[in-house]
């Protein structure tokens, strides 16, 4: 039965299921259903003598505690009231802080209790606000989005083999082969937290799950079939039944279906709908980038609309900016034209004020605008920074070669 989540524009129906696994003596996963906060999470604990169970439960408890606090709720309320980039960043900051708090709490517990030393846990959190899902990810749990005929793996596993299992469109390439986790809560003093958000629409389904679920799925087709079967309670039940039939590990999943929209807004934060995301990922900055990285990069962008004949400035509020075209046509004074997926003023993202003629919009045009300061902020993640700066370098080299040929 669909229900209302406070400060979320859609009704939602959700269900949880789990299984201990054929050969496990302890259940070391943990799940969080907190619809009153718009928060859902799954953790998969690691460590002997029940320590994994302790770590997983501490993770979800601390996330719930942090996101129910005054600071987090104020950030969410501010985003609901006005979904601008600053408000979006506040929500991200609170969500990241909640995961970091959980990491610190787990490590403190391990220091106080010798039998818990070495424990850790993966963690995937989905926090709904307005018409978006904000996601925090650490470890090898996963969040999937099923919409229309596609199933997208939104998160990227923090394992050595992760990149080889996901193609440039975020699709599964085959069953998991397993590998050591390179990042999780409790392992190190600083935990890497992947942050992303997606817009949601009526009919979308989100799956949050531990590796005991997806490890038994043979690819996108099987996952799609199971995830779309019946109501959320039937879907998650089918996924866990499949895991229990073939797997030995704990398996935990939450399925959330987005229902009817009951709040209409004029100041809609368009975010990343499916068509816009596909166009943006054609840009030289994001081409062939794993989906989770692309979503993180685009969380620093704001959508703008520029009228026919208007030019595109290189600076906004004393900060250099770059643009990715979503639709429309931009024309240069030398009659060159570019369309959807084009990246303009790429040099701005490395702090260089470009020279040359300023292009203008041939028609009303929608673009994503990225400030240099915001780009630098998302590049604090060394993995993402490596991918983005490599693409920027290649694009700028091509631009220089093309300019030389035109000269």
Language-model-derived ranges and their functions:
Residues 1-307, 320, 329, 349, ...:
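PP2C/PPM-type serine/threonine phosphatase catalytic domain
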